[in-house]
Amino acid sequence: MIVDKIAVEHGQEIDKVAPWLQRHIQAMRMREVVEKLKKIYVPSAEEIVKYVGERYKRLRPRRRGLAGRREFEIKRLELVYNIVRDKLQKVLEMPRLEAMDEFHRRLIEEFIGAEVYEEALKRVRLAIKLARRFWDEYRVLIATSQSVEEAKKYRKEGCGRILSLVRRLDKHLKLLRRVREELVQTHVVSEGLPVVVVAGIPSAGKSTLISRLSTAKPEVAPYPFTTKNIIVGKVVFKNQIFYMVDTPGILERPMHQHNQIERKALVALTSLPDAILFLYDVSAERVQDVVYQTRLLEDIIRNIALKNGVKVVIAINKIDVADREALQKTYQYIEEIKKKYDSVVVGPYNISALKGIGVEQLLNELIKLLPSKG
Ligand SMILES: Nc1nc2c(ncn2[C@@H]2O[C@H](COP(=O)(O)OP(=O)(O)O)[C@@H](O)[C@H]2O)c(=O)[nH]1
Ligand SMILES: [Mg+2]
């Protein structure tokens, strides 16, 4: 894998390299994982068996007599073995957990379980090995059979044993297939560009801001293993291209209110951002007061920013219709937050996502925090 080479050439292990390089490695891994998964097809056991059956029907004996029969039955066995091996070997191209970027790895760890995933791959590997053993064994039995009946009997037995290996893999194949399908969906954030994750209570203006700043209509993709979505806008600003990501329902409430799925989703999400943008809603229509919003901010600082060494940029949104009292309180709370988490917090910037007030200055600050393209 290319990224391992980079780390090795730098003479260091991945977690010891500089943060920017680590980010770069993660981004490249992320892309590699998705590119790889796109090219893999994970069949069900039933599909493999059915495919074998179709191909099997087309085989015809070429010679008469016992020698011809042996040759024919070996051909049939070989066909079954070859198909099973090829299909399963393709499945084994699924990346090992240790070769994955953190986002994808954590998704699997949280929603599937690391052991369950590795076990599935192990079973597939084992099935290939056993299939090979049956092929070796039964090929000899058929080749040395003393009658047409005996040749048939061994072929039946050999094919049966190989196909029963496949049938017993069914559960594991289904799991790998699901993992593949879920992770491939993350292609919209897997191009290797820097990521800014936007947080804030519902109606704070996250969607409005992302729509305003993205070059095209934001893309919506399923958040793997959940019924939630990831919304991604691509932002181009002064030579910098990055993603602005919204994850509705995940960074909108303090974490003690999260259900199990949201907690898992958050754990995976933690490794994604290069910076976090937190939006305060200071309008009279805000659905939560600013104390609540500050608690959410603090949660995000502790659970994402501090753990991953990324900054949180604070923007006070809806400045065009700000409620005076809420605005003043917000300044006070932010002051306190800055005292507590001085090195992590940037801002605040007053903006109106709707009217476009202050957004250029905000972008200027945001891009300073992102790894540069080159
Ligand atoms: N006046 C005003 N309204 C805004 C502003 N930003 C967003 N809104 C409105 O607030 C509502 C919720 O915005 P939305 O972007 O959907 O919030 P989200 O839930 O955080 O994605 C919408 O009606 C927006 O038009 C702003 O800067 N000023
Ligand atoms: Mg929204």
Regions found by a protein language model. Name each.
Residues 125-175:
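Charged, amphipathic alpha-helical linker segments immediately N-terminal to NTP-binding catalytic cores
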Residues 189-191, 213-243, 251-267:
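Switch I (effector-binding) loop of TRAFAC-class P-loop GTPase G-domains
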Residues 243, 273-280, 304-320, 343-350:
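Conserved beta-strand/loop subsegment of P-loop NTPase cores
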Residues 259-284, 298-307:
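Inter-motif core of Ras-like GTPase G domains
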Residues 271-294, 319-326:
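Conserved Switch II/interswitch segment of TRAFAC-class P-loop GTPases
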Residues 320-374:
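Canonical P-loop GTPase G-domain recognition
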